[in-house]
UniProtKB/Swiss-Prot annotation:
Enzyme Commission code(s) on record: 3.6.1.23
Keyword Protein transport: no
UniProt protein name: Deoxyuridine 5'-triphosphate nucleotidohydrolase
Cofactor dependency: Mg(2+)
A Pfam entry, by short name: dUTPase
Tree of life domain: Viruses
EC class: hydrolase
InterPro entries: dUTPase-like, dUTPase-like_sf, dUTPase_trimeric, HSV_DUT
Function: Involved in nucleotide metabolism: produces dUMP, the immediate precursor of thymidine nucleotides and decreases the intracellular concentration of dUTP to avoid uracil incorporation into viral DNA.
């Protein structure tokens, strides 16, 4: 699915091209015309406490279980990568850092993987999730005190022992809005580690055990995520698994445990 920050006044359905004969349906409801490979200026006049902005994309998505939606940017803006759960029924929003008035957003479905092998029991380190959730919450392994502009590398007491599928660490929307940004990072082998930065103007203390990030397991690689940038930009086609879109009217999204709470990820 390629979309900038646009959408359609009618509801639309997407059928993904899967490895199996069965088709999966993605429901999309949005309020303005779709703009493919284009962009429009979104203005938000309600910044968060550290100046980060919530930018509503005029888009609602209902994904099947086993999928998530990735919200990213094209170009050199300052949009945090966002993960939207299959169970989210609210309006999708992007979190944008101050200092750049224009951004082009890119939304695409991700196929989630069932699991990976680790040297210690997986749930000794990562929190369990519901079937409709995208990622496993990551509790902070120790207290972190981040001064303005300060960053720390977080290393979890777990090693990956297989090469099946792909694993990525993403931030949480609620912390992003406070200026606490996780560098999206692949976990390829060895220990799980990632950087977290305070881009706000005030010191922040993250308590031991506080949820600071999420681990997302995917069936396709996201090669543009390297762990070196807090705001990585996606190329034109981030997925090998490409959805084929069919447009229709009057689809009703199934109910979910998550509903419209939060930003669409495990961020709230």
């Amino acid at each position: 699915m390629e979309e900038s920050a646009g959408a359609t006044s009618a509801q639309s359905a997407a059928t993904s091209v899967s490895e199996s004969p069965a088709e999966e349906t993605i429901l999309v409801c949005a309020s303005e015309p779709v703009t493919v490979d284009g962009g429009r200026l979104l203005v938000c006049r309600s910044p968060g406490p550290e100046g980060f902005y919530k930018v509503p994309l005029g888009l609602k998505v209902a994904l099947p279980t086993g999928y998530a939606m990735l919200v990213a940017q094209r170009g050199g803006g300052r949009t945090t990568n966002g993960i939207v759960d299959a169970g989210f029924r609210g309006e999708v929003q992007a979190i944008v850092a101050p200092g750049r008035p224009r951004a082009q957003f890119y939304c695409t479905p991700l196929r989630l993987a069932p699991g990976i092998a680790t040297d210690v029991p997986f749930f000794e380190v990562f929190a369990p999730k519901r079937d409709e959730d995208a990622g496993y919450d990551i509790p902070c392994p120790r207290e972190l005190v981040l001064p303005p502009g300060g960053a720390e590398t977080v290393t979890l007491p777990v090693h990956r022992t297989d090469g099946r599928h792909w694993a990525y660490v993403f931030g949480r929307s609620s912390l992003n809005l406070r200026g606490i940004v996780v560098f999206p990072t692949p976990w390829e082998s060895g220990p799980c580690r990632f950087r977290i930065q305070n881009r706000g103007a005030h010191p922040v203390t993250l308590e031991s055990g506080q949820r600071v990030a999420q681990l997302v397991l995917t069936r396709e690689p996201l090669g543009w995520i390297t762990g070196r940038s807090p705001f990585p930009a996606t190329p034109r086609a981030p997925m090998q698994h490409r959805p084929a879109w069919l447009f229709a009217r009057d689809f009703v999204a199934p109910s979910s445990a998550r509903g419209a709470r939060g930003f669409g990820s495990t961020g709230l």
